[in-house]
Structures are given as C-alpha cells and as structure tokens.
Amino acid sequence: MDLLPPKPKYNPLRNESLSSLEEGASGSTPPEELPSPSASSLGPILPPLPGDDSPTTLCSFFPRMSNLRLANPAGGRPGSKGEPGRAADDGEGIVGAAMPDSGPLPLLRDMNKLSGGGGRRTRVEGGQLGGEEWTRHGSFVNKPTRGWLHPNDKVMGPGVSYLVRYMGCVEVLQSMRALDFNTRTQVTREAISLVCEAVPGAKGATRRRKPCSRPLSSILGRSNLKFAGMPITLTVSTSSLNLMAADCKQIIANHHMQSISFASGGDPDTAEYVAYVAKDPVNQRACHILECPEGLAQDVISTIGQAFELRFKQYLRNPPKLVTPHDRMAGFDGSAWDEEEEEPPDHQYYNDFPGKEPPLGGVVDMRLREGAAPGAARSTAPSAQTPSHLGATLPVGQPVGGDPEVRKQMPPPPPCPGRELFDDPSYVNVQNLDKARQAVGGAGPPNPAVNGSAPRDLFDMRPFEDALRVPPPPQSVSMAEQLRGEPWFHGKLSRREAEALLQLNGDFLVRESTTTPGQYVLTGLQSGQPKHLLLVDPEGVVRTKDHRFESVSHLIGYHMDNHLPIISAGSELCLQQPVERKL
C-alpha cells in the first residue's frame, strides 16, 4: 500500500522562496520570471509576437491619461539622415515612405486591454518605457525611452508632413461620445472597408467584406468620395491635421485638434490605412480615410499622438480660468455655429447638410473651393486666426462706403495663405484642473463629471474648448458705431425675426447676434431658403475663408457692387436687395 509523503508542518520561519526553488529542483520547471511592471497601470512589456496583426489604435486621451501607450516603432530605430520613415534633421519636410526592407510593424492593443482587463498582457514596441519620468512631467501618453519620431519644435511649429492618399470620408451619424471603445474601432474599420470597396485601386479592395451589421449601418451614413484617390500632403501639428492636394496645393480640409474625437488604424487586411473622426462644416461628423505607403501608417498614428501630447503640455503651462456653462456656450465653438439658443438644433444653416446638427468644432474646410467663381469670397469658417497668418489687410483708410463706382474699382482682397489657428494652443483637463484648485485651496464650482453625477467620455475633446476662448475684440465697439449708419443693419434681431423680413431671392440684412457680443450675422434668401453667415471670426476680424475685410460694410459693399456671390457648401448667397430697417 503506497503512502503519500507527509506534508511538512507549517513553520513561520520557513523561507518560502527557498522552498520554491527546492521544490522546483525536484523536477518541476521554475516559473518564468516576468519583468516588473512600470509605475503606471499597464502590464509588463512583451516583445512583438510574430503574426500578431491587431489594429493600430490612437484614441483621444482623456481623462484616463496614464493608461495610454502608443506603439512607436520608429522610436526603437536609430534615426539616420536618409531614413525615409521620419523627417531628417536637416529640415526635410516631407516624409515619403517607410523603409522598404522593414518588416511588419507591431501595432497597439485595444484600449480595453490597456485598462487591465483580461488575461493577455500588453506589449508596447520600443523597449522599456520611461513611465516614471514621463508621468512626472504631467504627460498623458507614455512614449518609448528613445523618444518620439520628430523634434517637438517641429510638431509645435510648421508640423510634420506625410505624402499619403486621401480616400474620402464616411458620415458618422452618432456622436462618438455615445459609443464604447470597441464600437468606435468597428466604426473606423467599417468606414475603411466601405471606402476600399468604392475607390478603384484601393489596397484593400480585393478582399471580400462582411456585410455591415445593423448597429454599424445605423451609425455610418453616406460617403463623400469627391477627392478620393487624390495624393495629398498630410501635415500634423499641434494646431490641426491639414490635408492639402499635392499637385494644386488646394486645402482639402483643416481639422483642428479639438474637433478630432477618435483616430485608429485598419484591421490586418487594411493595415496601411489611418482613419480619424472629425467635424467640419462640409461633412459634419465624418470618418476620414487616409491610405499610407507601406509601413507608414504606424508613423502617422504616432505623430498624431505626439501632437496631442504637446498640446496637453502646453495646457499645463497655461491653464485657463474655470468657466461657467453659460460662458462655455458663448465661447469659441458655440458662438460660431449656434448663436441663437431659442432655435431648434436642426435648423438649416448656411453650411449645413439638410437635417443635420451644426458642427461643434472650429474647422477650416475648403472642399468646395474649385466651384467658386473667380475672385469670389467664401463664407466664414469658425476658426480663430492669429494676426500673423491672416494675410495682407486692405490699406487703412480705403473707402468702404459712398459712391458705388469707387467700391467697384477696389481690387479684391488678397487671398489668405495657410493659417495656424492658435498662437499657443492650450488645453483643459477639467478633472486635473479641479483637483489642482482644490489642492491650493482655490474656490470654484464643482465639476459634476468629477463628482460622478454625470458620466465623462474618455474620448471627449470638448473640454479643450475652454482654453480656446478669447475675449471680445476691442474693435467691436467702433464696428457697431459704423454699422448703425448702414440701412441694411437691423441691430439685435433673432433668427426668426430676420427670416420674416426676407421676401425675395437676393434679399439680405445684417443683424447682431443676440447671444454672442461682437458677432454679426448676414441673413439672406436664396432659392427660397434662408441662409445665415457669420461675418466676424473669434479674433474680431471680418473675413471669409479666402479674404479678410476692413469692416462688415466693406464685405457687403464688395460682394454687392461687384455682383459676386458668397459660396459655401455648394450653395450661393447673392446680395441683391438690402432689406432696410424701419425707423
């Protein structure tokens, strides 16, 4: 009869680690030693696994900042002057393609796995992370020890440019804030698949796509393939993602960072694609698709992450004051697209698709530029402009009223060059701001999202708009005095009251916004539909997308006397008959 060996009695002085080694020597294999976890909540670092083709995902970074890791393949490569995958140190601006002999790039795990759920361990390419050093400086993205792909001053200045192909965009009908992370990733993948099927010559067009599930079909809308397949220069900076046609230098779109809510790569069959969701006046909320040369998609994602990182550090150096919800509505984004609070949100704006809500982000988008008449001015985009990038102004003292013949002889305002939107982009992380104020004993209204009474979205970029508020321009007083002498200026007037005064096509008037001081709105009737066009940008400059004017009177006189329509989003607004105010 076999007897089991007696178990050793418990001894509090027993060395458990030594006993484990002794037991392992009896035939069992000692457990593999795992690397110690970093200071953040991520698991240990693993080397890239062969055949692991999980998609690249860069999501907007708030408020779970310390949990995010970016795959940074080029961070582990020694940079050389002739390396095509990153900008050279001698000022080379365009990044052409990745190294031809480079293998498949390791990609980033899902955010759900990064947050600690599941048994799979997280890996981040590029060696050990400098997590402690990075967190000490208030960053929210852990980068490889060897650093980002590009110098910070280049990303904060002119930006890093990549030669890619613009494949079009797919309308997103629901707010990304209302979707979980997995659904957002599926939305971007499905948008990439839709575009690959629709555009001839797309890299992923040969594979058979699964039918779109019902939930995704209710989220994705129609596609816009106007510029599909066009080679473009993608410039990534702390201000925006700028898409410019490589041949004619036409700006296809300029999406500010605060209007971008999600960015991701494709699935294994579409690994060379980058998709990001942004808002603009033309496409509303849409998922824009970029096709990258082989091996370059990961660099594009990493550079976007670097731009977000730098913008957040700029906020830490210059945190804005805490604003009330009413001030937030009267700030940059609200004043630009929804200045009339009493109106329903689905009202037809001058630059809206029918039935769609006005966009919330400040964006410059010139998709319809080629359809404009020569010399025609475009509608104002709701973007702040720094004076050094607004283009040449008209000579001071140039007549803007009086004899129409004199105004007709005035040359058209010079076109504006490419613009930077903010001198010093600054960000708001409401949670960190409230904690900092409480630590120093500062007083301020509590944030309901921080206290848990309202859910906060991890990818919500809207808190940044607090940092973008600008005070009312001082010249608004003189502008108001000047407008009082114009017969077509009606003072403060609601949208409904203004539309009631329009009877014939070509009727127009200018009114002052009832909710935003210093903002003036051009209201006109075209093809039986009222149009509402903002005339003053957040810097207090009267401008259209291509030109700036000395005053509102100058803008009205220039377009009316020269019979030039204002073109925006495929529609024209002709200024023919001014509706004079009643005394």
From Swiss-Prot:
Chain positions with Phosphotyrosine modification: 349-350, 427
Chain positions found as N-acetylmethionine: 1
Sections of the chain in a coiled coil: none
Pfam families: PID, SH2
Major site of localization recorded for this protein: cytoplasm
Protein modification: Phosphorylated by activated epidermal growth factor receptor. Phosphorylated in response to KIT signaling. Tyrosine phosphorylated in response to FLT3 and FLT4 signaling and by ligand-activated ALK. Tyrosine phosphorylated by ligand-activated PDGFRB. Tyrosine phosphorylated by TEK/TIE2. May be tyrosine phosphorylated by activated PTK2/FAK1. Tyrosine phosphorylated by activated PTK2B/PYK2. Dephosphorylation by PTPN2 may regulate interaction with GRB2.
SMART domains in UniProt: PTB, SH2
Biological role stated in the UniProt entry: Signaling adapter that couples activated growth factor receptors to signaling pathways. Participates in a signaling cascade initiated by activated KIT and KITLG/SCF. Participates in signaling downstream of the angiopoietin receptor TEK/TIE2, and plays a role in the regulation of endothelial cell migration and sprouting angiogenesis.
Protein name per Swiss-Prot or TrEMBL: SHC-transforming protein 1
